Amino acid sequence: MPELPEVETVRLGLQPAMEGARFDTVALRRADLRFPFQPDFTDRLTGQTVTGLSRRAKYLLADLSSGDALLMHLGMSGSFRVIEPGGEATPGDFHHPRSEDRSHDHVVFSMSSGKTVVFNDPRRFGYMKLFRRAAIEDEPFLKGLGPEPLGNAFDASMLARACAGKKTSLKAALLDQRVVAGLGNIYVCEALFRAHLSPKRLAATLATKAGGPTERAEKLVEAIRTVLHEAIQAGGSSLRDHRQTSGELGYFQHSFAVYDRESEPCRTKGCGGVVKRFVQNGRSTFCCPKCQK
């Protein structure tokens, strides 16, 4: 599933095509994705102007001139592509062309900018929903999400408070969207490696007895921010389905230190350890047991 950097990469690609533009036509090529489209979805969206395009956790949010907001989730295999007025996909910054199967083009937005935005989703785990922007605090998909890891509210003190007293593992805590929003398996593994922390370590050890942040918490917050910034700059990680809106692949996967590197040498200078893979809560975890404690 796309994580924060992949969704942010998609947002940056959609922004020039959608922000400030009007939905001239909305074509739904099936009645549902993961969930059925709302009966008035097309009518509410057609003719509205996108006043802002943002991201919350792994969701894209398009604010509309009507006061509605369009929530979009990529699911497991969803992707957007932007087609220029001449019919060509927007050129990308990277090198790998997209393999298109247009039978999975389920939603087509024709924008007043002359560009066409297409949502393609082979597995159909993605979804879209309209809701009133003023009621965002009550929107079920967004309610209860933790702070953004790249936002000002996310710091070592906040993370220590969220983890204080927790008996769960550090990795499980970071994957809990109520603790911090948008992190997934890839970037949690990579951030824990950079902070030299074991994914098996108790989350509670990020807090002192008084509830303040430990040095571990400080290092982890810095590692999370750094990994996410680098991944966004690289266009995200393309392991299976992620594509940018240009149809190009991201390339942060070439910078992985531990994820998907089982039995390969640890990249910490002088460590000499080997990356191990094991299963935590049904997900593969990658780490170097020698330098992650």
Swiss-Prot record:
Record gene name: mutM
Zinc finger (FPG-type): 257-293
Superkingdom of origin: Bacteria
One Pfam family from the record: H2TH
Description of how the protein assembles with itself and partners: Monomer.
Classification lineage: Bacteria, Pseudomonadati, Pseudomonadota, Alphaproteobacteria, Hyphomicrobiales
Provenance organism: Rhodopseudomonas palustris (strain BisA53)
Cofactors, names only: Zn(2+)
Protein name, per record: Formamidopyrimidine-DNA glycosylase
UniProt keyword annotation of DNA-binding present: yes
EC id: 3.2.2.23, 4.2.99.18
Comment on bound cofactor: Binds 1 zinc ion per subunit.
Biological role stated in the UniProt entry: Involved in base excision repair of DNA damaged by oxidation or by mutagenic agents. Acts as a DNA glycosylase that recognizes and removes damaged bases. Has a preference for oxidized purines, such as 7,8-dihydro-8-oxoguanine (8-oxoG). Has AP (apurinic/apyrimidinic) lyase activity and introduces nicks in the DNA strand. Cleaves the DNA backbone by beta-delta elimination to generate a single-strand break at the site of the removed base with both 3'- and 5'-phosphates.
GO BP annotation list: base-excision repair
Zinc is among the record's keywords: yes
Family listed: Belongs to the FPG family.
Catalytic activity, as annotated: Hydrolysis of DNA containing ring-opened 7-methylguanine residues, releasing 2,6-diamino-4-hydroxy-5-(N-methyl)formamidopyrimidine; 2'-deoxyribonucleotide-(2'-deoxyribose 5'-phosphate)-2'-deoxyribonucleotide-DNA = a 3'-end 2'-deoxyribonucleotide-(2,3-dehydro-2,3-deoxyribose 5'-phosphate)-DNA + a 5'-end 5'-phospho-2'-deoxyribonucleoside-DNA + H(+)
Active-site residues, Swiss-Prot/TrEMBL: P2, E3, K58, R283
Ligand binding (DNA): H104, R123, K166
CDD domains per record: BRcat_RBR, EcFpg-like_N
Keyword terms: DNA damage, DNA repair, DNA-binding, Glycosidase, Hydrolase, Lyase, Metal-binding, Multifunctional enzyme, Zinc, Zinc-finger
